Amino acid sequence: HDQSSAASDVYKRQVWSLVEQFFSNKNFNVLSIDLPGHGNSEGPCLNTIENIADWLEKVFVKLKLDKVILVGHSQGCLEMLEYSNKYKSRLQKLVFMGGSYKMPVNQDLIDLAENGDPDAVKLMMKWCYEGSKKFIGGNPIKRIIQSPKDIRKILAVDLVACNNYLNGSNAVKTIDCPSMFVFGALDKMVNIEVGKKFANMVENSTTHIIDGCGHMIMIEKAFEIREKVLEFLQK
């Protein structure tokens, strides 16, 4: 595809493996990024969405990427919003999955995570998959967040960053590239009506709702979603 050589898709690693492989095989240059403190990346986690957007820009500059297609899920949607707010000239297309322009987090969940309590992970798994038990390759959260230290140093920091991000309603107005919004009909973490409101705030956008799917779209319905995203990217 002509556009693929100029565009790179950015995913967080591991949870995106089924999607990443598919797009690589379709001749897209796929870049899977572990944020600082996550996966194979060293250093402490970045504690604000704004800092993450700035860090992503440094990565793209370092790699000399002129144009990128960003694909993000949940917290990643906030990161994409803030990136658009600051660096939209680099953007070619955006794909938002299971997210909104604001993502307040239950204080009880934050408290559990800050205390390194494994119940924080159990709660997240319950909310991620409630009403939908069909996902491919097992539940990834157990594999990614394994110890009380991980819960304190990674999960808690990410939850607070999401909770504290308040610029989304302004940032969404800066989006002027083609955008796709994907939501799971059974998502308990991002209400479908909230999601639709988010999508309607962007003029040049398309929305796809996946039946029988919860929050973890790219795992629960990997095969369906990658075909839909490919269709959007080829337009």
Label for each model-derived stretch:
Residues 177, 191-200:
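Short alpha-helix in the alpha/beta-hydrolase fold that links the catalytic acid
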Residues 1-7, 11:
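Single conserved hydrophobic/aromatic residue that forms the stacking wall/gate
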Residues 17, 25, 29-72, 227:
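Active-site loop/oxyanion-hole signature of alpha/beta-hydrolase fold enzymes
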Residues 175, 181-183, 187:
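Short beta-strand/loop motif that positions the catalytic acidic residue
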